[in-house]
């Protein structure tokens, strides 16, 4: 049985989907774009966008009672792979600051993302 996850600490879904689903032992987030849930704003800086997307993922994971250290897989969608080093630095800082091991990850370049942002991140977390 699955349960929809909803939190005001991450942006509301902008389409017919939920922020995440709780499957009991597994949490799957929808892709989180770097919209600040309090202001609705988006930074132009790709490092700041990476950080905000990860904070939004974390908010969905925490709404299910888990934490960043429970994330076991992420998929990162970027508009420009030339930003790879900048994304990696922000990504590394986020997991280090949250005392979380680095999860498995895929990173793919895409033509376009919702709201023309530069990055979107989705995650899978496990309840242990």
Task: Name these PLM-found stretches.
Residues 2-128:
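Short, polar/acidic, helix-capping and beta-turn segments at strand->helix junctions
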């Amino acid at each position: 049985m699955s349960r929809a996850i909803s939190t005001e600490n991450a942006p509301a879904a902008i389409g017919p989907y939920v922020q995440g689903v709780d499957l009991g032992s597994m949490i799957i987030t929808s892709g989180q774009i770097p919209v600040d849930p309090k202001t609705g704003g988006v930074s132009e800086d790709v490092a700041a966008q990476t950080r905000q997307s990860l904070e939004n993922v974390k908010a969905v994971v925490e709404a299910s009672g888990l934490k960043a250290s429970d994330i076991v897989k992420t998929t990162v969608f970027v508009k420009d792979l030339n930003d790879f080093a900048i994304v990696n630095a922000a990504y590394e800082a986020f997991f280090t600051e949250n005392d979380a091991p680095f999860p498995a990850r895929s990173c793919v370049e895409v033509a376009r993302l919702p709201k023309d942002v530069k990055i979107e991140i989705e995650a899978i977390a496990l309840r242990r």
